[in-house]
């Protein structure tokens, strides 16, 4: 009996872990790059646990303390860049992408993206049907975004964020799975990205896109947290 209970517990734990995500790989020109080669190693590298405190400084890139250095990948403005997850996305919720420009003369890998430096470039939420909401990102292992064509040349952090909303009916129940890739954009334009926000600071735990009951009382429309998407 004890063996059966232990086996059931292990299966349950494994199932929960498999529903969690990390994004260790950039996808550029159709090629999946190496684990953490161009992505800052995240603190949940082994645990796969999501963040639940939107006021934590870990909301920037969820970096692992003392992480090894990552390199910078050159990408073209207007091109499609992606992140690969090490497991299919099981939890329902939106995916958002942000960028932050590294100041000229600063080392990309050691730069801390504090203050109002982040601008949103894409967000993907649910699709409404007669049976309720469906989430196009569910069960996906690769998520893509187009780098804005008019973004100025330079070094940037590209931040992916998937918000799991299965327990979002409680304050602190939403789980944030995120990572930051390090890219150098070439062939860009003279756009002025914005509005810019900070992490932490861009979200509140009671924002309607973070605190909501998708099981008992789902809202008519999903409200994304954070700023408007820059139409660059």
Curated annotation (Swiss-Prot):
Chain residues that bind Cu(2+): 20, 91, 177
Biological processes, Gene Ontology terms: cellulose catabolic process
Cystine pairs: 61-180
Localization of this protein: Secreted
UniProt-recorded Gene Ontology molecular function terms: metal ion binding; monooxygenase activity
Key word Oxidoreductase present: yes
Gene3D superfamilies in the cross-refs: 2.70.50.70
Signal peptide: 1-19
Required cofactor(s): Cu(2+)
Biotech / industrial applications: Lignocellulose is the most abundant polymeric composite on Earth and is a recalcitrant but promising renewable substrate for industrial biotechnology applications. Together with cellobiose dehydrogenases (CDHs) an enzymatic system capable of oxidative cellulose cleavage is formed, which increases the efficiency of cellulases and put LPMOs at focus of biofuel research.
List of residues binding O2: 166, 175
Glycosylation sites: 184
Catalytic activity: [(1->4)-beta-D-glucosyl]n+m + reduced acceptor + O2 = 4-dehydro-beta-D-glucosyl-[(1->4)-beta-D-glucosyl]n-1 + [(1->4)-beta-D-glucosyl]m + acceptor + H2O
The entry's keywords: Carbohydrate metabolism, Cellulose degradation, Copper, Disulfide bond, Glycoprotein, Metal-binding, Monooxygenase, Oxidoreductase, Polysaccharide degradation, Secreted, Signal
Keyword rRNA processing part of the UniProt annotation: no
The protein's name in its UniProt record: AA9 family lytic polysaccharide monooxygenase C
Species of origin: Malbranchea cinnamomea
């Amino acid at each position: 009996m004890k063996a059966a209970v232990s086996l059931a517990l292990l299966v349950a734990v494994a199932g929960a872990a498999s529903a969690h995500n990390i994004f260790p790989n950039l996808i550029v020109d159709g090629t999946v790059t190496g684990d953490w080669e161009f992505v800052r190693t995240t603190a949940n590298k082994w645990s796969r646990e999501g963040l639940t405190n939107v006021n934590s400084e870990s909301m920037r890139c969820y970096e692992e303390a003392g992480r090894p250095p990552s390199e910078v990948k050159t990408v073209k403005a207007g091109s499609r860049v992606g992140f690969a997850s090490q497991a299919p996305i099981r939890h329902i919720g939106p995916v958002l992408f942000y960028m932050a420009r590294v100041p000229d003369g600063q080392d990309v890998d050691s730069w801390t993206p504090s203050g109002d430096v982040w601008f949103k470039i894409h967000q993907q939420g649910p699709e409404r049907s007669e049976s309720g909401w469906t989430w196009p990102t569910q069960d996906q292992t690769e998520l893509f975004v187009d780098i804005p064509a008019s973004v100025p040349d330079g070094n940037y952090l590209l931040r992916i964020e998937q918000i799991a909303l299965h327990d979002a009916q409680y304050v602190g129940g939403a789980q944030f799975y995120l990572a930051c890739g390090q890219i150098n954009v070439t062939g860009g334009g003279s756009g002025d990205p914005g509005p810019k926000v900070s992490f932490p600071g861009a979200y509140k735990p009671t924002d309607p896109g973070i605190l909501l009951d998708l099981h008992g009382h789902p809202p008519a429309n999903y409200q994304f947290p954070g700023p408007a998407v820059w139409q660059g």
